[in-house]
Amino acid sequence: MKHTLVRRAAAIRTATALGLAASVLAVPGSGLAGAATGDTNPGDIVLGTITLAQAAATTPFPGITRTVYQDTDRTWTVNVMDIDPNRAPITFDGSIGQGMYTTQTVQEMLEQTTGVTSRRPYLGVNGGYFDDGVVLDQTDRIYLGDLGGTSMKNGRLLSEAGGGRYAYDPVTGKAVGLRPANSVLMLQNGRPYITELGTALTVRLSDDATVSRKVDGVNRLPGRAGHCLRNTDPANTDVTVAGGVCFDPSEIVEFTPEFGARTPAADLLKQTATTTDDDPGVEVLFNAAGVATACFRPGATAGGIVSDAPRGGHDVPPGGRALEGTGDGAAWLWDNACTGRPVSLHTVVTDTRFGDTVADTWFGRAPAGAVELPIDPAMYATPVGDVLLRDASVVYQVPGDTARAWRTAGGADAFGHLFFVTVEGQKGGTAPLAAGATRSELAQLLKALNLVDAVNMDGGGSTTLNLRDQNGSEPPVTTTTDSAPRHVADTVYAAVGGYGLAK
C-alpha cells in the first residue's frame, strides 16, 4: 500500500532512505568522526577536539543496549539507547499523559501507561517541542501541553502543523524562508522514521461545500499558536508574529477528547498585553455522530441548542468534538453550525518528504473528489526540531552555531533500530562544554554512531531519559538544568510488545 500514513511498513522507509549508503555495512555505534590515535582507544568517539570515551555499556532489557560516554573532563555525559525490535518483542509508542491540556514529567507519563508495573515501558525520553508561554501553575512549572507541530495518536490528529522551521542558506547561514511543514519523529509498526508533515483542516456545510472555513488549530488556545513560525496569512492582516508565536484574533480551533479537560474560556492567559484570546466568541459541541448538540454565544436568545453563555468550560462529548471560534471564526460558527445545518470537518495530512497524503472526514460527507484514507492508528508522531542527519549525511550545517544546551535526539540506523541519545552538560560547571552541546556537535555525534536519519528534539531543561527499575518505577537517569525534572507535553518510549524476528 502506498500510503505510509495509513499502513505501509515503516521499515521500507528506512531502506528507502539508505540510498545504499556505506553505513549499511557498518556495525551500529562503531563509526568514528576521527581516527583513534594517541591517547584515544578504539571505542572512543572523536568530535574535533572533543574525545568521548566509553564509560559503560549494558543491556538493561532484551534488545536494548545502553552505552554511556564521557569526555576527558567528565563535563559531558552522553547516553546512547540502541533499541532493536528484531531482537526482542518491543513496541514503540508515545504518550500525552493526562491530556493535551497540561504537561507532566516523563516519569509520570510512563508510569500512567498501565497499572501493571511489569508492563510499563522499558524506557522513555522527552518528546516534542511545546508552548511554554502558557503557564498553568507557576510554582510547579506546569504548562498547557500545546505541542509545537503535527502530533498524531490512535488515528487522530491531536495538534496541527507548526508551519515549518526556517530553511538556511548553506553559505551565509541566514534564514531564507520557511519549510512547508514541520519535522516529526514517527513511530509505526515497530519502526522509526523521520519526515515532515503538513496539515490542512476545513469545516464546511455538508449540503453546500462552497460554504466553508479554515480550522486554524487543534487542542490549543484560540488566538495563540505557539511555535507557528509561519508567514502571516494574507487573508488575516491582523495576525501578528512575535518570538515564533502567532497571535490571531479570528480563529476556529478544534478540541478532541484527548484534550483531557474542559474547553478553555476567554482570556485564559490573563495577560493585558495579549488580547487575541479575549473574545468570548462561540462554541459548538458535536456528539460522536457529528450532530451539533449545543451552541454557546453570549447575548444569544436561548432556545433549541443555543445558550446565552460564552465559550469555554465545557466537556468535549465522548467520541465527539468541540469547535471554538473567535472573531470571524465565531461569526462563521454562529451563522452555520448553530443553525442546526449539518457540517463536515475535513482533515488532510501531507507527508512532504515521501509524498503521502491522508484525508479523513470525521463526520458528514467528504468533499467531492476527496480520497478517504484514515490515519493509521498504529502510528505515533511527535513534532521535533531541526533535522540533523538525512540519508546518512549531516544536513544541519549552520555557520556560527555556538548555542549550547542539554540535548535530546531521536533517530534510526540502517538496520531499523530506534536510537535515543541525550547529552548532558555539567550543572554549575565552568568548563567550555559545561553548557552542553551545539546542534552541529550533536549532528556529528549522531553521524559517528552510524545513524541514517536523526533529529534534534526538545532539550535544555526538558532533556530526560528514564529507565524502568526493578520495582516498576520509571526514574530519570539523566540530570536536569532545572531544580527538578521538567513537565513536558509528551514522551516517546520503547515498551513490552511487538514481535522479535531474529533467531
Task: Identify the role of each PLM range.
Residues 1-35:
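Secretory targeting and sorting signals
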Residues 34-333:
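Zymogen propeptides
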Residues 69, 134-178, 347, 374, ...:
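Conserved, well-ordered active-site substructure
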Residues 81-84, 124-129, 413, 422-425, ...:
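Active-site-proximal beta-strand/loop segments in catalytic clefts of secreted hydrolases
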Residues 123-127, 186-187, 194-196, 344-347, ...:
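General beta-strand structural signal in soluble alpha/beta enzymes
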Residues 135, 348-366:
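Short, Lys/Arg- and Gly-enriched loop/turn segments at beta-strand edges
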Residues 193-231, 358-387, 391-393, 397:
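A short "linker-to-beta-strand initiation" element
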Residues 337-345:
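Loop/turn positions that initiate beta-strands
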